[in-house]
Regions:
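Active-site segment of SDR-like NAD(P)-dependent oxidoreductases
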Residues: 1-4, 108
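Alpha-helical segment proximal to the catalytic Tyr-Lys
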Residues: 28-32
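C-terminal substrate-recognition "lid" of short-chain dehydrogenase/reductases
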Residues: 78-104, 109
Length: 114
């Protein structure tokens, strides 16, 4: 929702979008002090926010099964919390990376930066 806003998702998407921009701004402002700032932009992760009820509602609205909804990306594979954790770990251990936003969404082309 940060780069692909949906109807009535402003209260969710706006802060997420601002936070991704802030990660980049901090990299500019604090990089000369050796401080790195990166972000992870994930999509469709089962969580306390994206509940089974929400997944069912969204799948029904798109006339697809819940499995197909969760695999609705270019890789046709559900993105799991473990995948997102690996992205955070990668950025935390990449000492020469700053100002990056790593997208973990299986290739959701509708949500790619334009």
């Amino acid at each position: 929702q940060a780069v692909n806003p949906g109807k009535n998702f402003g209260p969710y998407g706006l802060p997420k979008s601002a936070l991704l921009s802030l990660c980049k701004q901090y990299a500019v402002d604090y990089g000369s002090y050796g401080i790195r700032s990166n972000g992870v932009n994930a999509d469709r992760i089962r969580s306390g926010l994206m509940t089974d009820k929400m997944i069912k509602t969204r799948a029904k609205a798109r006339s697809v099964s819940t499995d197909n909804y969760m695999r609705g990306n270019l890789l046709l594979d559900e993105v799991k919390a473990e995948d997102v954790a690996k992205a955070f770990f990668h950025l935390a251990t990449s000492k020469k990376t700053t100002g990056a936003v790593l997208t973990v969404d299986g290739g959701n082309i509708a949500a790619s930066l334009r």
